[in-house]
Amino acid sequence: MSFKNIKAYTTQNLQAEMAVADSYRIIQLMMQGFVERLAQSKGAIERRDFEAKSIAISKCMAILNGLQDSLDLSYGKVPEDLFALYDYMRIRLLDASRDMDISPLDEVCQLMLTIKSGWDAIPLEERKKALTKQASQ
C-alpha cells in the first residue's frame, strides 16, 4: 500500500470516528493530533524544512485554539489554568518556530502528554455523568 493510500485511509478513518464521537473522545483525538503535529514540527526543524515546519506548527496552533474553545471557563480555576497553559504552549511553539529550536517542542510535548494522561484517566462513569449533564443543558 502506498503512502498516499495510507494517508487517505487514515484521514477517512479519523473522519468516521469524529462523526460518531462524543465530546470527550473529540478532545482526546485533538490532543493526540497535537502530539503528532508536534512530532512533525520537530522532524521538520531537524531537517531545516521551513515549509513543513510552518505547516505543522500552524496545525498545532489551530488545535490549541480548538482546545481553548472547548473549555467552559464558568467552572473556575481548572479551565482557567488550562486556558493559560495553552497560551503558554502557543508562545513556546512560536519560540521553536522563530529559533528553529526543538527544545520548546519537547517542553510543549511533555505538557500536553501530562494533560492528556489526566484526560485519559477520567473514569467512564464520570464521563457519562458529564455527557448527560451537557446534553440536558
What are these regions (language model features)?
Residues 1-40, 45-47, 52-57, 65-71, ...:
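N-terminal intrinsically disordered, cationic/polar leader segments
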